[in-house]
Amino acid sequence: MIDNITGEKERINPFFLPYDTPHYTVPFNRITLADYEEAMMEGIRREDEQIEKIINNPDEPTFENTIIPEDEVKGRKHYYDLLSRVESVFFNMLSAETNDEMDALAQKMSPILTKHGNDVSLNPKIFERVKYVYEHHGELTPEENCLLEKSYEGFVRSGALLDEAGKDRLRKLTEEASMLSLQFSQNVLKENKAYTLHITDEQQLDGLPNTAREAAHEAAKEHGLKGWVFTLDAPSYGPFMMYSTQRELRKELYMARNTLCIKDNDTNNLELCKRLINLRREMAQLLGYDTFADYVMKHRMATKVENVYKLLNDLIEAYKPKAIEEREEVETLAKEEEGAAFKMEPWDLAYYSQLLKKKKYDLDPEMLRPYLELGNVIKGVFGLATRLYGITFKENKEIPVYHPDVKPYEVYDKDGSYLAVLYVDFHPRKGKRDGAWMTEFQGQWIERDGTNVRPHASLVMNFSKPTEDKPALLRLGEVETFLHEFGHSLHGIFANTRFESLSGTNVWWDFVELPSQFMENFAVENEFLRTFAFHYQTGEPMPDELIEKVIASRNYGAATACLRQVSFGLLDMAYYTHKEEFTEDIISFEKKAWAPAIIDEQRMDTCMTVQFSHIMAGGYAAGYYSYKWAEVLDADAFSVFKKEGIFNQATAQRFRDNILSRGGTEHPMTLYKRFRGQEPTIDALKERDGLTKGQ
């Protein structure tokens, strides 16, 4: 369009136009802050129009004229589905590339978007049509049945059967919970990014490997400082806690990390957590459930709270004796080093655990870094997918990205056909939250004309950064994280379902971690390491002796690590099995809730809950146990590959066909048994963790 006064071409919001980028990828380079609000408001208006069309259809409600259109309104991220498309970009940027203006816009738009979602899910006229189809439908395919069930249950679980007073109350609860979840995340991010440990005396770097020193020197320059800067981001925090000989500095860093959001300031999350727990409890009880956990279990493989506790208690029984042995061994070494009177504190654990590992296996994780250069690791991980599934990856610099660090790849199937776009974003920066995750800018679905719309997946991580004279050299744990998130992306890349809301990672939460945790198993497999672990300077392969040490030490600390995850699961369930109003002190409650899985003396001046985004602001409320549930599945599944060959393409094809490509189109156990031939047992997990010997 041409402006009549200036004669200049009028700018059009890029969200309003069909993307003219490769594969209809997001034109990040054209999007401004103002575009988001305008597009979201227009998207709401358009969705309202679509809902009215469904409601006012004079024909008898059917699967074709009600369920499919209703699913399309709520789910698609393609160029004609404006609201879902702009939301997927905005909220992904809120985690990966945010700023104060983005945060403020999120605070403004969150209640508006929540209200719109409630307007749809609590609309009695559209529910009436969905309910009619649910009660009168004819023969449907299994996938259609799944969508119908999901649609009907979605309305019911959103309050469609409540009276008007109940609906109004539910609206208020969900709107407040949405705002508080956002505030929780923003508080954690602000406090995390605000802290730095600035060192100017080089003697205080004693014990730290060169990679940590160089990264800290780069961080200091980024902050406009001389010397070295350490932060609470994992690539900085982890090595400092493992290697620094400066006990007081370890304590300072530990306390900074573990006292986030409990100080007397405007980012304190203590009362906010109580309110979120109570909001979710009240929502669940309004919908007829005793607790929020009962509400969640309706759509979980676990099915009942009792089954979750059985898993967690079985793991405590199996792993706690070994974890106590592991801790006693670390404490014995610490006393040998420091004297019999030495009392080990939490900020000592990583340091002495690392010393013990080095003593037992003659292995220091820093010995591995030169062989784990990021470029080689990328080739190794992508090459693993090529070897298993025949797919290939091609970087396409014509695809726009949201930050120069991000690399976009096209993914092609073994027959050469286009499969997906995959973005990878590896390093920490200001405005990017801590941790690692997989997300999507576009899902997968099949159009009515048969067109298979392919996904745009993104892997976001916080790995060790390159320095002035070294490329990014990773820890083995970072390689495992890469494999984990890559496993999630394969769940999306291989998706091949008719409906987007059943596609890829749109599965029950205690099944969604199977593909990701399954991939982690390859990290310590000799055959896999030999494909990419080459010295970044000499090109020499990782020595056999070093690989043997990695494999020999694979179970080091496994019981302690298991109990840590179980403790988080216990904490999560304790909050969300609460039947009465939660009024207890968060810190005291936390220590009591996870006590059965704790083997150390507890501190009352630290708190996990206030920064536990998974269960307070993420999708894992009453669901953190899912990691251990899926670990049982992944160990059982990988045992098949160990038996048939870890690169066995026939086994991999069976995994792809029955699990990775099917999304949520059938019950997860049905899909798993079709791949495995039987239900999983805990035996493979215990064997993998060294608690039992293989048969």
Sequence positions of predicted segments:
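Intrinsically disordered or highly flexible coil/loop and linker segments, enriched in small
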Residues: 45, 49, 53-60, 82-96, ...
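C-terminal, non-catalytic "cap/extension" segments appended to globular domains
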Residues: 3-38, 42, 229, 376, ...
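Short, hydrophobic/amphipathic alpha-helical patches that form generic packing surfaces
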Residues: 78-92, 149, 153, 255, ...
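Short, glycine-/Ser/Thr-/acidic-enriched flexible segments
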Residues: 235-237, 283, 414-416, 426-430, ...
